Amino acid sequence: MKYVYKFKEGNASMRNLLGGKGANLAEMTNLGLPIPQGFTITTEACTSYYENGKKISKEIEDEILSNLKDLEELQGKKFGDNSDPLLVSVRSGARASMPGMMDTILNLGLNDIAVEGFAKKTNNPRFAYDSYRRFIQMYSDVVMEVPKSYFEKIIDELKESRGIKYDTELTVDDLKELVKRFKEVYKASMNGEEFPQDPIEQLMGAVKAVFRSWDNPRAIVYRRMNDIPGDWGTAVNVQSMVFGNKGETSGTGVAFTRNPSTGEKGIYGEYLINAQGEDVVAGVRTPQPISKLQEDLPECYKEFMEIANKLEDHYCDMQDMEFTIEEGKLYFLQTRNGKRTAHAAIKIACDLVDERKITKEEAVLRIDAKSLDQLLHPTFDPTALKNGYKVGSALPASPGAAAGKIYFTANDAKKHGVGGLGERVILVRLETTPEDIEGMAAAQGVLTVRGGMTSHAAVVARGMGTCCVSGCGEININEHEKYFTLNGETFKEGDYISLDGSTGNIYKGDIKTAPASISGDFGRLMSWADSYRTLGVRTNADNPKDTKKAIELGAEGIGLCRTEHMFFEKDRIPKIRKMILSDTVEDREKALNELIPFQKGDFKAMYKELKGLPMTVRYLDPPLHEFLPTLEEDIKELAKDMNVTVEHLKEKCNALHEFNPMMGHRGCRLAVTYPEIAKMQTRALMEAAIEVKEEDGYNIVPEIMIPLVGDKKELKFVKDIVVEVAEQVKKEKNSDIEYHIGTMIEVPRAALTADKIAEEAEFFSFGTNDLTQMTFGFSRDDAGKFLDSYYQNKIYEQDPFAKLDQEGVGQLVKMAVEKGKQTRPNIKLGICGEHGGEPSSVEFFYKVGLTYVSCSPYRVPIARLSAAQAAIKSGDRK
């Protein structure tokens, strides 16, 4: 088996083996572009490393060394040589781009002797020692996990003692002093072990570090957020160094062939003169726009533009390129399809179709369905913005508007933000690192002091759809005491600020945001998607406002209308409580009759908004105790209204308490014990449907869904009650309206006996939230407490409540579909759990033959696009 490939031996199709970066370097080499040469250690070598107890086998090591020898001959330099040493960079490169997840090591091969030879050869001792101190810092951080901050602190102290501001002002002697101090830090951190002087030891250490980084906590989190399997592994690219820090005719930069925020055509990027590549990406210094390169180095600019256009034409997609200029000679270090905002992705896809570079099908396949979430992003309310007080501005790194309380660490943001206390949070950092990813995910917005438009914060925030403003150098931040100052204003932890990620403006206070509006390209792309998909898309909604929004976003009806939400309103909750706590059927019916007008009014409003589109109504599902009063004053008021004592009412409430309510007295079990509930709901629904049909002329066919059925006889019992009342209402109103009765498949037993249940049910809708909960045997509300340990120990890679577990729960769905169709070949099949808007789950539902998926209103576009992508991938057509 071959574990190492020279760049010239690979091509773009070998992505799974060489990783994205390695495959692109090979492709660019074969296109004859100026690429520093090197070799790629494959993803299979990474898998072998883990299978081998985290060791690199002798076979792989020998192959690496043999390729290193060939590289020495090609470059005419020797590794570890004291007169003209070969230096290399070591970078990771997985199949899928994982920005900032894996770290780079530059200048590998330097040691105490080689640095002197390097200084002589380049006739630039300052440059040689600068390269060496950077290498010690990176190697210590990435390979040996010595915190970066130790080294930053030494640099800051030295600059302060010399009275200088920039790294570039350090002299040769200063840099030699840094090398000495850095080695001391290494030795102290490594229990007295000296910094490695053998370049081969350095190289093998770096390769192992890249393999190890595939499994660091932030990589695991990123993979979970982006559905990347853990067994893919990462490749390692070893590439001969070129230097952007050799003086004023050298430089380094990052550029995109189109704007990654807006999608506008034209080169967008930035560079630094006399710097190394990681300085731009890590956002340590704030760079110049690429257009200025035309003034600084016109020849390089011309060649750069030619190659950039050639790469975009070759890949037929927007490219993200890293380049270095060494003493006036341009080199490309990598290219990849650029990360972009959802807005930019849609514009680029539509423009490429108009430019005849890709087909409409390719355009639909190119959009990451999950990213459509970002399009529905808030902007500032124009009136509120006019009155806003702008305190500064920086780079608009990721679009959207955000306002929230300031927190200075990722942990605090996580604690207070989304998934924590649920506050609106703005994460403020000197610069973000990949460790901050969970804090960024919990925040409404991110503000950084350092870094450009292509820094870690910018790239990750764009990918998440989080608003980000970066590179605000005027901020003085005191992370220890948790405050920062900007233009004379002081902001402490917990104070509100507002960020505009589209303009880069920073405002004092909490500015009101307004929801997003969608561009014309979105409509074009979605109409192409709808022309390919065969799977229907409905929404989960239980009020006219959500229904209206979902239909605007393309929903074809309602797949789940939860009736219990209609009872929680102030004027209704006392009536439902009265019904629950009544002692006799008569009292219960009396209380329920008071609810009919409310429930009927709700259904009428929904049907009017739907204008003839279908609606599946789920009968009362939650355990009754959820409706009961807990506050003393509510109990007193209800006791008075029901003419009973407070003690009696409390006893009654306690009697309804359940040990395990999610598996208790809920769903169709309520209708079995209290048939009057199902009667009331049927009357309200049928009257509403008949009246709207007569008033507005819509063709309405009510779909009545009985929840939590586990047995055919159970369904028949409730169905008989429903049919009796429905027929009675039809007779009273002299109507011939049709209606369908179906069930939720959410108890595993229902899936196992779906052929029997289909004898009574005219449709199934899979309630995958409960089905997941009951199949795994853990509660959705409590699973979060232990699932993290499952991810860390690689028992699960994904949250089964967010992404359907296709091996277990999915098999129950598949079985129920097959059994249901055996009994009733034309049975309508839907899914209304949260999984209905998750792309990989939608693809699965399409493959097993469901009729439609139903999801929350804002996920409707995601489901439409995912359904189209599933159809295109399978070769199926409308």
Stretches found by the model and what they are:
Residues 207, 214, 376-408, 524-530, ...:
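Flexible inter-domain linker/hinge segments
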Residues 1-388, 414, 423-426, 433-438, ...:
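Nucleotide/phosphate-binding sheet-loop regions of phosphoryl- and nucleotidyl-transfer enzymes
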Residues 393-435, 486-524:
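Extended, non-globular alpha-helical segments
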Residues 91, 518, 528-878:
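Conserved alpha/beta-domain cores
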Residues 237, 407, 426-428, 447, ...:
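Structural motif
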Residues 39, 449-451, 470-473, 561, ...:
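Short beta->alpha connector loops at strand-helix junctions that form conserved
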Residues 329-331, 433-441, 445-447, 453-460, ...:
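Glycine-rich phosphate/ribose-binding loops and adjacent secondary-structure elements
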